């Protein structure tokens, strides 16, 4: 089991990245909340990881904090929740926000995540309620990410990368494009910032 990687961030193509560890490039998929915290390409980075072994592939998932990894592991233990849906949930909501939704048994936020209907949301809340009783949360509510701007990038490529990342989470191309188009003053924003604002608009309403 690979539990942590420390190396140089070699590539960043949301939601995937490659970390160079002593000349070996490890490809990972990460939730958007982790992506926002990553350094620039070429800088040192450390991520906590979870390895999923399938017959046709070994898939590595990365997280900025151990707590995020533990949440991911709790989610994929649930019936009908695979890595893709777990990442979609974690990309739209910070750990504290998702835990509070479960503790309050509030399905209204969960149903805004692609792939989560009303029945699925209600089932997830019931199955996670006991597991999250001991989880502590900070007092702030719906602080999806900081409002500070992220690094500037080429507008056309940043928007294309953002749409691609949203589609990978389960949104339809039209929904993703519409969410990006609805962002005000988006000229020069990075793909990470575009993703952050679009998810905030679609989920944390």
UniProtKB/Swiss-Prot annotation:
Gene3D superfamilies from the UniProt entry: 5' to 3' exonuclease, C-terminal subdomain (1.10.150.20), DNA helicase RuvA subunit, C-terminal domain (1.10.8.10), Nucleic acid-binding proteins (2.40.50.140)
DNA repair recorded as keyword: yes
Localization per Swiss-Prot or TrEMBL: Cytoplasm
GO molecular function, one term: four-way junction helicase activity
Keyword DNA-binding among record annotations: yes
Record's GO cellular component terms: cytoplasm; Holliday junction helicase complex; Holliday junction resolvase complex
Coiled coil region boundaries: none
Superkingdom to which the source organism belongs: Bacteria
GO term, biological process aspect, one: DNA repair
Region (Domain III): 154-205
Annotated region (Domain II), positions in chain: 65-143
Region (Domain I): 1-64
InterPro entries: DNA_helicase_Holl-junc_RuvA_I, Hlx-hairpin-Hlx_DNA-bd_motif, NA-bd_OB-fold, RuvA, RuvA_2-like, RuvA_C, RuvA_C_sf
Region entry Flexible linker, spans: 144-154
Keyword terms of this UniProt record: Cytoplasm, DNA damage, DNA recombination, DNA repair, DNA-binding
Note on domains (UniProt): Has three domains with a flexible linker between the domains II and III and assumes an 'L' shape. Domain III is highly mobile and contacts RuvB.
Subunit: Homotetramer. Forms an RuvA(8)-RuvB(12)-Holliday junction (HJ) complex. HJ DNA is sandwiched between 2 RuvA tetramers; dsDNA enters through RuvA and exits via RuvB. An RuvB hexamer assembles on each DNA strand where it exits the tetramer. Each RuvB hexamer is contacted by two RuvA subunits (via domain III) on 2 adjacent RuvB subunits; this complex drives branch migration. In the full resolvosome a probable DNA-RuvA(4)-RuvB(12)-RuvC(2) complex forms which resolves the HJ.
Role noted for this protein: The RuvA-RuvB-RuvC complex processes Holliday junction (HJ) DNA during genetic recombination and DNA repair, while the RuvA-RuvB complex plays an important role in the rescue of blocked DNA replication forks via replication fork reversal (RFR). RuvA specifically binds to HJ cruciform DNA, conferring on it an open structure. The RuvB hexamer acts as an ATP-dependent pump, pulling dsDNA into and through the RuvAB complex. HJ branch migration allows RuvC to scan DNA until it finds its consensus sequence, where it cleaves and resolves the cruciform DNA.
Family membership noted in the UniProt record: Belongs to the RuvA family.
HAMAP family the record matches: DNA_HJ_migration_RuvA
Record protein name field: Holliday junction branch migration complex subunit RuvA
Gene name of the record: ruvA
